[in-house]
Amino acid sequence: MTKHAAYSSEDVVAAVAAPAPAGRHFTSFQALKGAPLDCKKHAAVDLSASGAAVVGGGPWFESMKASSPRRAADAEHGDWMEKHPSALAQFEPLLAAAKGKQIVMFLDYDGTLSPIVEDPDRAVMSEEMREAVRRVAEHFPTAIVSGRCRDKVLNFVKLTELYYAGSHGMDIQGPAACRQPNHVQQAEAAAVHYQAASEFLPVIEEVFRTLTAKMESIAGARVEHNKYCLSVHFRCVREEEWNAVNEEVRSVLREYPNLKLTHGRKVLEIRPSIKWDKGKALEFLLKSLGYAGRNDVFPIYIGDDRTDEDAFKVLRNMGQGIGILVSKLPKETAASYSLSDPAEVKEFLRKLANKKGARQP
């Protein structure tokens, strides 16, 4: 197996360790009935100020508050940034920690490479971001790890030289093309293929049809088919109907004990009840690339959602590489560093590619 070139940072004197943790396909868009709704306004509602009774809220209701965090006080934000400093501000020390090691890049899609938008079908990445990812992939093995269907995220990214892990890592495929001589040979890369939940396809399809019918009565709700999992989006649902979405989904899942319900940013996720997540996908890809159990590897995982926390935790447990959370506001995370938005992600990727490119003969 042909290796990627390891990253070297001779101009950086000292390595700085990552800081310790803080402790801690779509249905058609439903036209809104009655008065028009400003999705952005409703997406930003702070549930803690609602005062509305939420039947059966509990942990789910609390998670929705977490997905619409209040604006943090300056002091709180400053404390959080001390524990999760900007990966741009700490760029040189970060590279020093990777000195002599093989960088492997893992990237979430929504909220990381593209902005979060009301219509998930319109979550396109910019040409500038695509170029930044392409340049990074010239130098380092690069994977997109997304909750989206693998084919859909490939259609968004449009870079065939990457590894893609869709459906929260349950559907993994190696590159269709390897353009650089230092990449894993094409035959070996194409052999990287894994589907963790094929036996669940019929039941996922059945639940998709049922939920699609159920959500027709809730304006703004959408069901996305991600092959091995389903996403019920409620970003454009009125706040007073959020619990109705939750109850409808739970009522369907009572008939399917082999499926589990998780949540992200204004989305409910339905997945097979198997021990597989984005962290497992990261481990699988490192092993497939021949990097498992090696000390000369430096994985970097960048993501914005709670589903990315599984990957951040894997890196912490490995004691190798770093996790970078994309967030403007403080939130509990196992990531070591932070970036505020996709624009900063793009700048980070550009700097990484430029540093590596400057060292080429």
UniProtKB/Swiss-Prot annotation:
Keywords: Growth regulation, Hydrolase
Keyword Hydrolase (UniProt): yes
Highest taxon, organism lineage: Eukaryota
Keyword Hydrolase appears in the UniProt entry: yes
Disruption phenotype annotation: Additional long branches in tassels and abnormal long branches at their bases in ears. Abnormal identity of axillary meristems.
Residue ranges crossing the lipid bilayer per the database entry: none
Free-text tissue specificity from the UniProt record: Expressed in axillary inflorescence meristems.
EC number of the protein: 3.1.3.12
Signal peptide: none
InterPro entries in alphabetical order: HAD-like_sf, HAD-SF_hydro_IIB, HAD_sf, OTSB-like, Trehalose_PPase
Class of this enzyme: hydrolase
Function: Removes the phosphate from trehalose 6-phosphate to produce free trehalose. Is specific for trehalose 6-phosphate. Does not possess activity toward glucose, sucrose or fructose 6-phosphates. Regulates inflorescence branching. Required to establish the correct identity and determinacy of axillary meristems in both male and female inflorescences. May act through a sugar signal that moves into axillary meristems. Acts upstream of RA1. May have a transcriptional regulatory function.
Sequence similarity: Belongs to the trehalose phosphatase family.
Annotated NCBIfam families: HAD-SF-IIB, T6PP
Name assigned to this protein: Trehalose 6-phosphate phosphatase RA3
Name of the gene: RA3
